[in-house]
Each structure stands twice: as structure tokens, then as C-alpha cells.
Amino acid sequence: MEHKAPLVEFLGLTFNLSDMLMITITCLIVFIIAVAATRSLQLRPTGMQNFMEWVFDFVRGIINSTMDWQTGGRFLTLGVTLIMYVFVANMLGLPFSVHVNGELWWKSPTADATVTLTLAVMVVALTHYYGVKMKGASDYLRDYTRPVAWLFPLKIIEEFANTLTLGLRLFGNIYAGEILLGLLASLGTHYGVLGAVGASQFPIMVWQAFSIFVGTIQAFIFTMLTMVYMAHKVSHDH
């Protein structure tokens, strides 16, 4: 069964209430995790602080693999925020979905191309901003004509391609996972209680476990590519 999105019109613009709700919930969860992990800092970390320090070390490793730390250290907070936000967003639609009057209200916000493409545009725009800020406008613009001027149109195309692939890769993986979970759940309803337990629940649990793995990998890939694109804009050796 196909479920439509809850849409409202305001000042000539169309808003998806489900996306707005899930984006807000994702932000709140990330904020709560960050506050809980840093509420009482200790020299010997335990619990949530230990987890948060592991995340910082992991993102620090991503940055070090793409650019030198003197240049990339300032992007540590950005990287941690991205990987936590995308991971939480990817996980929200896995346990269940909520439908009200044929409208889908609870899902992963990253299962909507509008959300992922908007996030990709914001990230790529940020790389351009830091490219101009750290290298100067003239040196930044000259990068589009290096090593030869005729590469300029190809590099413009590359910028659009990077944005599209960054957003659509995330959307495609998460959306496909939720669609298959929905199909497996509906399979059980067609075969009754025994069929639901035997033919639906086990595949659902297996696919949910795989979707957790995919969602985690996609959060890593999104953050890694963000730092790769950032390195191309801010490093003088790119």
C-alpha cells in the first residue's frame, strides 16, 4: 500500500510535515546524546563520554586521511555533527513506521530525496565557502582552470555531479531499505499470524540488522565524502 506525505501549503510554498517532524526529532536526539556525553566530563571517561570520545577519534581519523590536521582540525565539529545526524536519521525508520489516515508520519528523514539533496547542497556550499575563505577568491577560482583552462566546464559539471551523488546515494540506500521492510511486513498480513511469524518476522529481523549496517556505512560515507570535497577546496596541494 502506498502512503502519501502530509503536505501543507503556506505562502505559496509546500511543506512536508513528516519531514519537518522527523528532522526535528533527529536534531533533538543528537542534541540529547551530545549533552548526556559531555554533562560531567572526567579524566578517565566512562559510558557516554567514552562513546563520544570514540566518535571524535573516529572522525579525526577521517579528517587526517583526507587533509593535514592543521587545515582540517577546524572541521572536526562539522564531521562529528554530520556522522551523528545522518546515522540517527538513518535509524529512525527501522523499528516501525506510523501511518495516520493514509499519510506516513514516522520514517527516516533520509528516505526522502528532498532532505538528502538539501543536506548535500548545504555541505557542498560550505566547502565552497571555506575554499574562498581559506585560499582567497582569486586562488580559489584559479583551481577551476588547473592544470589546463579547458577543464573549467568539466569541473563545473563535477560540482553538480558531486552534489547529486552525495544526496541520491544516501536517499537510495535508506529508501530502498524502508520499502523492503514494508513489503516484508505486508507479506505477513497476507498469510495470517503463523505466516507472519514464520515467513515475515525472521526476514524482517535479518533485513533490519542489514539496514543498521547499511545506515551506519552510509553515515560514514557521507562524512568521508564531505571531508574529501572539503580537502579539495581548502588544501593547496589539490
Swiss-Prot record:
Q: Where in the cell is it found?
A: Cell membrane
Q: One GO term of the cellular component aspect?
A: proton-transporting ATP synthase complex
Q: Name one GO molecular function term.
A: proton-transporting ATP synthase activity, rotational mechanism
Which UniProt keywords are listed?
A: ATP synthesis, Cell membrane, CF(0), Hydrogen ion transport, Ion transport, Membrane, Transmembrane, Transmembrane helix, Transport
Self-association and partners: F-type ATPases have 2 components, CF(1) - the catalytic core - and CF(0) - the membrane proton channel. CF(1) has five subunits: alpha(3), beta(3), gamma(1), delta(1), epsilon(1). CF(0) has three main subunits: a(1), b(2) and c(9-12). The alpha and beta chains form an alternating ring which encloses part of the gamma chain. CF(1) is attached to CF(0) by a central stalk formed by the gamma and epsilon chains, while a peripheral stalk is formed by the delta and b chains.
* Stated name of the protein: ATP synthase subunit a
The protein's job, in short, is:
Key component of the proton channel; it plays a direct role in the translocation of protons across the membrane.
| InterPro entries the record matches | ATP_syn_F0_a_bact/chloroplast, ATP_synth_F0_asu, ATP_synth_F0_asu_AS, F0_ATP_A_sf
Lipid bilayer topology: Multi-pass membrane protein
Zinc-finger keyword on record: no
Q: Name one GO biological process term.
A: proton motive force-driven plasma membrane ATP synthesis
Name where it mostly resides: membrane
